[in-house]
UniProtKB/Swiss-Prot annotation:
InterPro entries per record: His_Pase_superF_clade-1 (IPR013078), His_PPase_superfam (IPR029033), PG/BPGM_mutase_AS (IPR001345), PGM_Phosphatase (IPR050275), Phosphoglycerate_mutase_GpmB (IPR023086)
Name of this chain's protein: Probable phosphoglycerate mutase GpmB
Pathway: Carbohydrate degradation; glycolysis; pyruvate from D-glyceraldehyde 3-phosphate: step 3/5
Site (Transition state stabilizer): 150
Record bears the keyword Isomerase: yes
Any one annotated GO CC term: cytoplasm
Catalytic activity: (2R)-2-phosphoglycerate = (2R)-3-phosphoglycerate
Highest taxon in the source lineage: Bacteria
Lineage of producing organism: Bacteria, Pseudomonadati, Pseudomonadota, Gammaproteobacteria, Enterobacterales
Source organism per UniProt: Klebsiella pneumoniae subsp. pneumoniae (strain ATCC 700721 / MGH 78578)
EC numbers on record: 5.4.2.-
Length: 215
């Protein structure tokens, strides 16, 4: 049975400023770097053999820190990027007009094919995330990969594995540097294919996530 670990990147400057990142980028904060080191300490005990990351800077830096702890190299895969947020990227959430907030809400409230102008739909995101996950099945036997990606992207992946449509209301919280695990199984008793073992584990982190403090 293949086990795949899923990690959201560490806290970034724009996370702290409540700016929309999407496929734009901002660096990890000092707290985000510490979170990544704590993932690395946990990952060191898991027998990780491959670290595959979104090619955006915040995920690359998170992956590099984890890789140093695990003694692995880092492989970049653009399919693991965050949802393209189109014309709203780099904007402060509190600056959105009523119309713009309506576009953003369509991505989280169950609107079929909701998208921000010049952006990506949740279905398009789901298709590329599942393709990236499926490529793990081509790794050598005994591999245990760890994928570093983004909050909306990983939430969409895990939710669709559970059978929800890609555009379903977002009800899965994956905090910065949370760890999830999905397994690929072939069983006569349980559902064959991808199953969710854990989602959003933050027990390895020693401080509350930024979004916990902002609520």
């Amino acid at each position: 049975m293949l086990q795949v670990y899923l990690v959201r990147h560490g806290e970034t400057q724009w996370n702290a400023e409540r700016r929309i990142q999407g496929q734009s980028d901002s660096p990890l904060t000092a707290h985000g770097e510490r979170q990544a080191w704590q993932v690395g300490e946990r990952a060191r005990t898991l027998g990780i053999t491959h670290i595959i990351t979104s090619d955006l800077g915040r995920t690359r830096r998170t992956a590099e820190i984890i890789a140093e702890a695990c003694g692995c190299s880092v492989i970049a895969d653009a399919r693991l990027r965050e949802l393209d947020m189109g014309v709203l990227e780099k904007r402060h959430i509190d600056s959105l007009s009523e119309e713009e907030e309506g576009w953003r809400r369509q991505l989280v409230n169950g609107t079929p094919d909701g998208r921000i102008p010049q952006g990506e739909s949740m279905q398009e995101l789901s298709e590329r995330m599942h393709a990236a996950l499926a490529s793990c099945l081509e790794l050598p036997a005994g591999s245990r990969p760890l994928l570093v990606s983004h909050g909306i992207a990983l939430g969409c992946l895990v939710s669709t594995i559970l059978g929800l449509p890609a555009y379903a209301e977002r009800r899965l919280r994956l905090r910065n540097c949370s760890i999830s695990r999905v397994d690929y199984q072939q069983s006569p008793w349980l559902a064959s294919g991808w199953v969710v073992e854990t989602a959003g584990d933050v027990s390895h982190l020693d401080a509350p996530a930024m979004d916990e403090l902002q609520r």
